[in-house]
Amino acid sequence: LLIRIKNLCNKNIVIVPGGGSFADSIRDVYDKTKMSENLANKLALKSTELFAEYLKELDNDLCLIENPKNFTKEEICVWLPSKKLSQNNSFKNNWDSTSDSVAAWLANKIMAEGIIFIKSLKDFKSKNKLYYLQNKNILDKNISIYLSGYNGLIKIVGLNILKKLEKESSWKGFI
């Protein structure tokens, strides 16, 4: 997927990865121990950075970056959010904020042209209401806070993205 994105897109791309199984492990430890919710959420946010390191291992051309002001057009950047968000009171660091909220928060801050959420979906309606996506746990419960006032394009794609990207020579009509 990273290779296809690099070949098809001539825009700034910032990846905000989820924490995946790393975050799931933190939640499991939190549920089974006396770990504070504050620490658990902090570690879950850091787990996105572990996944970022894994992406970097898969594609050494990716740049890992902490400061959103340092994104470049020449590279696909993967944002490491824990330092910035731990210093920012406008982000709700709790279990209702996942990487969905992190991506929406960042998109709003940098006035991104669009956000693409890549989800493990097979079948998906082309238009959905936000509350429906939240109730189905497709998007997190806090995302509406960060999408408020956001004017960019929002797309949610599932497993079908790989098949579509194989056939496309550009992003037009796709995003």
Regions found by a protein language model. Name each.
Residues L1-F174:
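Nucleotide/pyrophosphate-binding catalytic subdomain
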